Amino acid sequence: MIEKLDSIEKKYEELENLIGNPEIIADIARWQEYVKAHAELADIVAVYRDYKKVVKEIQDTIALMKEEPDEDLREMAQAELDELTEKKDNLENRLKMLLLPKDPNDEKNVILEIRAGTGGEEAALFAADLFRMYSRYAERQGWRTEILDANYTDIGGFKEVISLIEGKGVYSRMKFESGVHRVQRIPTTESGGRIHTSAATVAVLPEAEEVDVQIDPDDLRIDVFCSSGHGGQSVNTTQSAVRITHIPTGIVVSMQDEKSQHKNKEKAMKVLRARLLDRVQQEHQQKIASTRKSMVGTGDRSERIRTYNFPQNRVTDHRVGLTLHRLDSVLDGDLDEIIDTLILKGGQA
């Protein structure tokens, strides 16, 4: 690994020199190419330089401990060494992740779809909890979340919520979240205090640009209707809601969140493009899966991937066997430990 990182750092320094070369600057196309390549290596080089600095500090601390006769000072040095070792391990894990082969979709924004599954009203409330968890995670990452469409229940749950998450590397962090999420808790409506199990499904789709997916307008059937609100009551009398059916695949997208029919159509097309691209990629993944099974599961949307147990304050990811006893912080968007583990295991598959 060190050899590879040394080679990357050398390449980074070469690019740095080229970017400052007046001859290269004069050739704008070449200069832009080098700037882009330089930027792509910046993160891994910064982490590697931090890693080398920590390794040097560890070596210096060990040398100091060997020569230090004072026991109190040796104990202080040992505490510092423990701290540095933990820092080194964390940086090593980050480097392993940064060295993983890039997924062509990693830098894309995502369409996040959450649907209440088995469990009625409790499942809808859990779908709302999951949406909040991902929204809080997005905030922590400096990303932007926008609800594209939502089907609310009377007590604040979601039968379905579709959102767009935009930012740097969103898909790279979110791609392993697709699947069935299960919750075990005592519902607020349950007088007997019994634990109920319900579920919600999550689908994470890379946002597709028009160049990624070609859609023939003749393949679309577009219906317009009056949008309805909570409990089915009419929100407005104009036909602003849109339903688009992609005839060849049978994929249907309905959108009624906006008051403008044009905006609803635009959002529906965004979701349709993402679903069509996802369909193509799922078919491709299934072909690969027949020869290589991923260590983080099949990626099948019907696969149960995670359990959230409220009485035990526990969350378990079944694909990597990771259990954390801090469900409260996970639901508040503290997902990095789970996501990092999934990325590392997924990259080694």
UniProtKB/Swiss-Prot annotation:
Keywords: Cytoplasm, Methylation, Protein biosynthesis
Keyword DNA repair assigned: no
Top-level taxon of the source organism: Bacteria
Modified residues (N5-methylglutamine): Q233
UniProt PTM: Methylated by PrmC. Methylation increases the termination efficiency of RF1.
Keyword flag Cytoplasm: yes
InterPro entries assigned: PCRF, Pep_chain_release_fac_I, Pep_chain_release_fac_I_sf, Prokaryotic/Mito_RF, RF-1
Signal peptide boundaries: none
Gene Ontology terms, MF aspect: translation release factor activity, codon specific
Protein localization: Cytoplasm
GO cellular component, one term: cytoplasm
Family from the record: Belongs to the prokaryotic/mitochondrial release factor family.
Function text: Peptide chain release factor 1 directs the termination of translation in response to the peptide chain termination codons UAG and UAA.
Listed name of the protein: Peptide chain release factor 1
This protein's encoding gene: prfA
